[in-house]
Amino acid sequence: MHIVLYKPDIPQNTAAIIRLGACLNLSIHLIEPCSFNLNDSRFKRVVMDYEGMCEIIRHNNFEIFLKKYHKSRIVLMTTKGKKIYHRFKFRKNDMLLFGRESAGVPKELHKILKNKIKIPMNKKTRSLNVAMSVAIVVSEALRPVSYTHLTLPTSVPV
């Protein structure tokens, strides 16, 4: 399973998502441009030493990403999605695409992507924090495969 972040704005969110990716053995794709440098102190403070434990793939733009992964199923997480995330049939190699914190993804991407899902929310609110959204959706997406690609460290009591 892959997490794809479209032009992320907030270094702390991206760092938290990379930590999640490291812990759950997920690849993280960053669609450039990011609004910050990966050497940013705010990013480094949150990512700690997890950055080296996670495959991070950077793409100069969405067109380059799409050209490389055009045969993959891309699932857009959006407040405009019609299907609720826990009713969606995730697959092992899905590319879970999350928009930028400030603006989501452009309308053009909404038009070309078929699979659009959402997290139900209070109608008085606009959106969840992107790192929280990633954690919620990824936990559900991995459930059908029973997290079989992970093992508990021997030092953790069961």
Language-model features: locations:
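Flexible, gly/pro- and Lys/Arg-enriched active-site loops
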Residues: F98-V137, A141
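RNA substrate-binding interface of SAM-dependent RNA methyltransferases
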Residues: M1-T79, L142
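Conserved small/polar residues in nucleotide/adenosyl-binding loops
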Residues: T148-T154
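Short amphipathic alpha-helical segments
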Residues: I17-I18, R42, R87-F90, E108-K111
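Mid-chain, well-packed structural core segment of small domains
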Residues: M77-A103
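Short, hinge-like loop/turn segments at secondary-structure boundaries
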Residues: R45-E51, K92-D94, I136
